[in-house]
Amino acid sequence: MAEADDGGNGDGATAGDCYAHHHYRDVKLARDASENIDSISSLPDVILQQILSSLPTNLAIRTSVLSTRWRHVWSDTPYIYFDGPGTLYRGLKADTINKTLARYKLPKIMSFHLYTKIF
């Protein structure tokens, strides 16, 4: 008769038992995490717009790929922020600014920031 390998701790558990327990726990944690993965989308638009207002405009626009609901949230933020010479907008062109403003929905911009270098 084969004896269970207790791993020297005297609990009689086999390596298979330990694996099964950890596997079940990992699956449960993954399932619990997946249930809450999109909780930010349940926030009201006004809160999402405030969050996006704290980001440079190009990063706020990138959130539009998250879901249909997010597609136009950035265009209702009261702040537009272009950071030209940094890593966010290399080679910022007037065409990029014009296209962004054309997609903007609000009738009034509360703040417009444009930082670029001519040369």
Curated annotation (Swiss-Prot):
Pfam (any one): F-box
Entry-linked InterPro entries: F-box-like_dom_sf (IPR036047), F-box_AtFBL13-like (IPR053781), F-box_dom (IPR001810), FBL60-like (IPR055294)
Gene3D superfamilies recorded: 1.20.1280.50
Domain F-box intervals: 37-92
Protein name from the UniProt record: Putative F-box protein At2g39415
